[in-house]
Curated annotation (Swiss-Prot):
Domain of life assignment: Eukaryota
GO molecular function, one term: ion channel regulator activity
Subcellular locations according to the entry: Secreted
Residues found modified as Lysine amide: K77
Domain notes: The presence of a 'disulfide through disulfide knot' structurally defines this protein as a knottin.
Role summary: Probable ion channel inhibitor.
Annotated signal sequence range: 1-21
UniProt keyword list: Amidation, Disulfide bond, Ion channel impairing toxin, Knottin, Secreted, Signal, Toxin
UniProt name for this protein: U14-theraphotoxin-Cg1a 3
Disulfide-bond pairs as recorded: C50-C64, C57-C69, C63-C75
One Gene Ontology CC term in the entry: extracellular region
Family in the record: Belongs to the neurotoxin 10 (Hwtx-1) family. 65 (Jztx-21) subfamily.
Prodomain residues: 22-49
Amino acid sequence: MKTSVLLVILGIAAITVQCTASESVEQDSLRTFVDTVLGWNAEMASEARCGGWMAKCADSDDCCETFHCTRFNVCGK
């Protein structure tokens, strides 16, 4: 009787650990997907700010390099 109760408790603990581990993997996959989408949106916003290759961005310290606004670049030099 005691052995069967112990086995049931160990089985429940093993299932709980396995389910928790699989949830972590699913959450990591979702987080990676969301980060990718948000990064892509930020990239699109940066491209929208650029007027073209090596054009000035809104901030005079920024300029477009490959259609992305980047800091610490001097446009045309």
